[in-house]
Amino acid sequence: MVDMSTRVVQISDCHLFTDPDAELRGVRPHDQVRRALQHIREHEPACDVLVISGDLAHDELRPTYVVLREMIGDWVPRCRIIPGNHDHRESMHDVFAEIVTPEQQEVCFEQQLPGWRILGLDTHIPGEVPGEIGDAQCQWAHDQLSAEPDCPTLVFMHHPPFSVETPWLDKIGLRNADRFLELLKPFPQVRIVCCGHVHHEFQRDGNERQYLTTPSVAVQFRPRTKNAEIDTVPAGYRVFDLHEDGSYETEVVRLAPAG
């Protein structure tokens, strides 16, 4: 019997501007995102789902989402998006209408895969840096998880509901992390919770569940620091291979330095 597997590629924290020459902490996000998407097309041709886990834009302007959509091109149908603290929900609904659930204010998603489900949750609070899972989103997540209690599930969200052992970043994570983790307790099928926001790779295992973060495709932050420090490691993205039997592998792929 042939094992059916699905390749999910996650990029995070694009921080795009409408102006392609705009810089953020010494890098041009426009160039970085274009390089990342080109690398994924060349090296991950088996990509079935492309997840962008928040901070698609930095300036929160509608034209910036149009720029990103043009970069993604014919891969838009396989793309799934959730907002970060720098995003603008209405623009995401408008520009990516065919991949965003129209009847919800939140920008979230659910997708059934062979042997797995993936969920994307909206943790955006307009005008603030930390995140939160609101009442409506908690109920939606509960309903989704209750519907398929035996299906291994991968949850994406922007703000980590766990410590990344970096004090200044832990202060701007998910405000109501305890509520979210309590919500997950009756649902052991949630095998992985994977986030962005912190601009570096992190992994923690606990309670038969893996907690991950994925580096930015733009600027990298040095982990385990008291204050924000830029790291010199290359930008990257994460790849998941989700197998029909419920097993999986994941790794972070780093981009070669621009030159």
What are these regions (language model features)?
Residues 10-12, 48-55, 79-85, 122, ...:
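Active-site neighborhood of phospho(di)ester-bond hydrolases with catalytic His/Asp-centered motifs
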Residues 16-20, 58-63, 85-93, 126-129, ...:
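Active-site environment of divalent metal-dependent phosphoester hydrolases
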Residues 62-147, 152, 176-189, 207, ...:
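Extended active-site neighborhood of metal-dependent phosphoesterases/phosphodiesterases
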Residues 13-18, 47, 116-123, 160-163:
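Short, basic/glycine-rich phosphate-binding loops at helix/coil junctions
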Residues 22-28, 127, 166-172, 226-228:
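Short glycine-enriched, charge-decorated loop/helix-capping segments at active-site entrances
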Residues 238-259:
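A short C-terminal boundary segment appended to hydrolase-like catalytic domains
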Residues 1-67, 71:
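N-terminal active-site segment of His-dependent metallophosphoesterases
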Residues 35-49, 130-210, 246-249:
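His/acidic metal-ligating clusters that form di-metal
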